[in-house]
Amino acid sequence: MAEISAKLVKELRDQTGAGMMDCKKALNETSGDLTKATEWLRQKGIASAEKKAGRTAAEGAVGSYIHTGARVGVLVEVNCETDFVARGDAFQELVRNVAMQIAACPNVEFVTTDDIPADVKERETNIEMGRDDLGNKPEAMKAKIVEGRVNKRLKELALLEQPFIKDSSLSVAEMVKQLAGKIGENIQVRRFTRYTLGEGIEVKQEDFAAEVAAMTA
């Protein structure tokens, strides 16, 4: 495979408005062919989605999902630019898919890694720095290992970084970008809440043997 230069990635980005990583992936998939890479991005719905990302998305919908057995429930707000799109089947399906994704991902706490507070990042870094397997590593190597582990952990906490449950070849972010490209509007997952039945409730543990003994004494 031909090496993809930074200059070629920048050229594709300038032409399409897609993100750097998306451009690099497109060029890798097409062996560095700029025209084919542009077509690849358009097919994925990415080429035009990035240019729309800066536009205001004030319409949208609050979606809900209750998992089978009513033990997990989700509320999620997804925004778009117009009420017309918000009422459309494609957008409504996306909102439901995002809600289902949240229900399926109990570890997810934030929409993106940028939303993760500094104290959470610091906590995760301290945890990784204290791992026993790093004790004899050189400081430079240790820092690199910790950075990689922390980044991996932060991605586990971010909704948009998760593999899409209906197509694991896509992340949730890529799935959203695809629809944004197809409908021609900026789409943003703004916030969500996940409820688990009984979460946070301390359940009293009964000593049934002692209870029976007391009743028969």
From Swiss-Prot:
Family statement drawn from the similarity comment of this UniProt entry: Belongs to the EF-Ts family.
Pfam families referenced in this protein's UniProt entry, alphabetically: EF_TS
Protein name in the entry: Elongation factor Ts
Gene Ontology CC terms: cytoplasm
Subcellular location: Cytoplasm
Role: Associates with the EF-Tu.GDP complex and induces the exchange of GDP to GTP. It remains bound to the aminoacyl-tRNA.EF-Tu.GTP complex up to the GTP hydrolysis stage on the ribosome.
Alphabetically ordered keywords of this record: Cytoplasm, Elongation factor, Protein biosynthesis
CDD domains hit by this protein: UBA_EF-Ts (cd14275)
Record carries keyword Glycoprotein: no
Major location (coarse): cytoplasm
Location of region: Involved in Mg(2+) ion dislocation from EF-Tu: 82-85
HAMAP family associated with the record: EF_Ts
Molecular-function GO term, any one: translation elongation factor activity
Domain of life: Bacteria
